[in-house]
């Protein structure tokens, strides 16, 4: 399998950049479209926060991967405790796999283990830059991304990071992660195209909910819709009763109810909603990628609900190859590290001295990776080409495939 990651051609780009797709096609096709959208460890859908540590250890001995001329830092919490460390190791494995599957990569990864610590991430970035890194991949957590971004900006070196907190994105600090704003934009767009104009919403009362609520209000208004009722609820049955009842009372005046929550909580929310007289066969339920969870597929009242997420075909293929190589399942975020490494290897091979320039990285035609189309905006956030799926008792079914290309706006 080749890990060539093609840049999609754009008529607006200089001919050298338009040629990238053709050059990579001759080297071998890269997996496009993919992803399951399970959440980060199926955990609470808040922007990723790092483990608390009392003092900053020096960056761990991450080592190097590859022997190419172009050096790239890879900063991950490999030795962190709990899920953070599991994610860090899996992402390091995926990065190694990307280089192994790429056709003659001219890249060397300088792996820096930050143990989930902000100061260690900063020190690791400084070390990597002193060792000649031309780009930084990672870190995973928002505070560390901010710290690394400051170091990199002073040296005019770009960062491709993995945090889900869009607040840490900026010029030169690009987020490759799954941003909840993309899920919201896609599901509202599809619902509007299906004739849904009036909406209710039940939003979890956590940082993820704050981000999603703002995006939802903005996207509904942009498409000429109306939010009739919206409530925030805590993650306990007693506390959610009042907010759910308030939205249920407005159910006869809405076309759809948006509930962006995970399999840990969504079944209780929907059960409370139906107990208050809402017929979910008459009111369309909408969700985000957090719905990509077998626990949700088994809830009868959610059957027929729509949600936005990457098409899962590519992720399944990636996971199969990962299991064959490492004898264990990858975490969901592993594809981010794979795509980041495949991207820079492709750019090194095709883009010459401009390989990591802002113009190259923000190519409006975007790139195609394990999780489908993506592109970086100038402000550091990203846009992804997502599918819309329908919940069924046998799993999710794609009802609107991801786009084959991006429009001109970015």
Show which residues each predicted segment covers.
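Extracytosolic ligand-binding ectodomains
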Residues: 2-23, 34-410
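Hydrophobic helical h-region of N-terminal Sec-dependent signal peptides
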Residues: 24-28
